[in-house]
């Protein structure tokens, strides 16, 4: 069988075996949602499984760093043991076993739609972070945060402040995009980047929107607290709408004449 035929067969098999876990599927990407708010996005290269490994991204707001490292290393070990063969079934089984073995102290997340916070905790907010309205859809909650940034140090500082807030730190995803300008020898240098944090493809859409709006020297983070019900493409619409709204509310983008 060709790589493409093996991928198609594997995807069909996974959809029939794990229908409750498989949130999204295309011929190049699979998105799984597990208990304990653990998510796994898997991207399939064109030469998988014969040559390249699938690329995975994990999200787990309730996992400690060392727990994530154990899971990450275990997934890599499973691939090494199965080089050249379909491996995703083994990966999903491993994640399920990992979750079953988690201690009870890793609690099930509670719905936070009515408990999303705006004040900062622990870290002093010296970046004047602004917070948008909370949007809820089928028990998931979304909230945008915005700050002016003019360096990578500013970007890192904003993230530290946001994640010092317990609720924001425990969001299922904190999707981030930023743009800022510096000068070298009088020439403007544009800097930009984005981070999906497990919500694959969401941050690049945010950055594209910021580019279209010509929003410079600004960073937007959209927090999503997953409520247990799959939203499909609607979640991308919510993330983009909140990004646009908080930028407009804070006078970023083209100025109206």
UniProtKB/Swiss-Prot annotation:
Swiss-Prot/TrEMBL GO biological process terms: cell differentiation; cellular response to amino acid starvation; GCN2-mediated signaling; nervous system development; regulation of cytoplasmic translational initiation in response to stress; regulation of translational initiation
Subcellular location: Cytoplasm
Keyword Nucleotide-binding: no
Signal peptide per UniProt: none
A GO MF term: protein sequestering activity
Listed SUPFAM superfamilies: Ribosomal protein S5 domain 2-like, UBC-like
Family to which this protein belongs: Belongs to the IMPACT family.
Protein name: Protein IMPACT homolog
Gene: impt-1
